[in-house]
Each structure stands twice: as C-alpha cells, then as structure tokens.
C-alpha cells in the first residue's frame, strides 16, 4: 500500500513536469501560481511584477502572459540561479541575495510594484524544525520587501513552510492587506508542509 501511494505521488509529480515541458515552461511550479491566480485574480494587464527567488523562471513566464506586453517584470535570485536561466523577453533579471539586496535596486526607475511574488524555499537540511525556521525567515523578508515596494492596492504571494510562527506571519499579512488567504495548490506534494500565503489589496506603508 505504501509503495502504491509513493508511485501515485511520483506519477502525479511527473505529470506536472511533463505538462510544463510540453507547454514551454521552465518548471512545474508554474501550475502552483496558475492555481493561486485562478482563485484570487492576482494580475491585471500592465502590472509591474517583482519575483523574488525567480529562477528557473516559470513564474515570470506565467506573469508575462497575464500582464501582457505593457507589463513590467523584475526577477531577483542568487547568481547561480540567474546564470542558469534562459533569457526572458521584457524582463529585468537581478543577481543578488534577497536578504541583503537594496530596495532601490529592485525598484529601479519604478515608483512601485503591483504584485510581489515569492516561491523561495530554503536549501533543506532534512531537519524539520530548521527548515521551517529558514522558510519563515525567507517569507518574513519577502513580506518586508513587499511592504516597502508595493503600491497601494497591490498583491503579494509568498511560500511558507508550516511551523511555530505560521499563525504569527499570517497575522502580519492580515494587518498589511485588505484580505489574506492561504492556498495549497493541487500540484504541491500531498506530504509537503508548504502553503502559499496571499495578501490582496496592500493598505499602504503608513497603515
């Protein structure tokens, strides 16, 4: 029975991998963002989008489809990730560490972003508590950046491993946005502790 469940999960993951390859996306993670977007309507034509931890690029590819030619895309990741990515039309790719990057570098000439995305996950150690703590630190930094660069009314999506501070971080999103939702996409592994926390309608930096 256990082997059958493992086989089912492997087939399921492979199905999304093959679908992404067939449709020209850089990774199966694209279907997580697609499902989130279908549930909450993240994007509008012409939006300015910041993707934190953007490699290998499937979320930027999906965002491009949603915001159209007039939209602006900015992606940030570590050098090893950026260097391995294929060129993305109309996207500005920045090489750097999300924990130390300067906000001015992210914004460039823009007054702000309409959507901030983060599919960042830590390099897992296999130690559950350590991985949760690292995920929480990445999520907290992504939220901090979103609070600094989002325009009023903007949206945020961040991946978070469920851990001791999960509720506290969700409350931080509730205080920052008009609406907060959590989504566990169908393309996520059933045994995964990841959740996507969504903030809709940024209240503004002074609220």
Predicted feature residues:
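A short glycine-rich, Lys/Arg-flanked "PGG" loop and its adjoining helix->strand segment in the class I
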Residues: 136-152
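Class I S-adenosyl-L-methionine
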Residues: 163-207
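Conserved SAM-binding loop of SAM-dependent methyltransferases across substrates and taxa
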Residues: 56-68
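Class I SAM-dependent methyltransferase Rossmann-like catalytic core
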Residues: 1-45
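Short glycine-dipeptide loop
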Residues: 69-70, 150-155
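Glycine/threonine-rich flexible loop motifs
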Residues: 124-135
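S-adenosyl-L-methionine
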Residues: 76-118, 122-123
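Conserved class I S-adenosyl-L-methionine
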Residues: 45-55
């Amino acid at each position: 029975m256990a082997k059958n469940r493992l086989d089912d999960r492997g087939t399921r993951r492979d199905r999304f991998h093959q679908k992404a390859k067939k449709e020209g996306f850089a990774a199966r993670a694209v279907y997580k963002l697609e499902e989130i977007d279908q549930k909450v309507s993240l994007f509008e034509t012409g939006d300015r989008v910041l993707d934190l931890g953007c490699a290998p690029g499937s979320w930027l590819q999906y965002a491009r489809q949603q915001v159209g030619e007039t939209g602006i895309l900015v992606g940030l990741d570590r050098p090893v990730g950026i260097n391995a990515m294929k060129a993305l039309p109309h996207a500005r790719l920045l090489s750097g560490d999300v924990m130390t990057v300067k906000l001015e570098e992210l914004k460039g000439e823009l007054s702000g972003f309409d959507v901030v995305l983060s599919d960042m996950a830590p390099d897992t150690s296999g130690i559950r508590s350590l991985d949760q703590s690292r995920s929480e630190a990445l999520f907290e930094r992504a939220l901090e950046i979103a609070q600094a660069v989002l325009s009023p009314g903007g949206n945020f999506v961040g991946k978070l491993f469920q851990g001791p501070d999960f509720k506290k971080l969700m409350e931080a999103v509730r205080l920052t946005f008009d609406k907060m939702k959590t989504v566990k996409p169908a393309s996520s592994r059933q045994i995964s502790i990841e959740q996507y926390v969504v903030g809709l309608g940024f209240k503004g930096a002074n609220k």
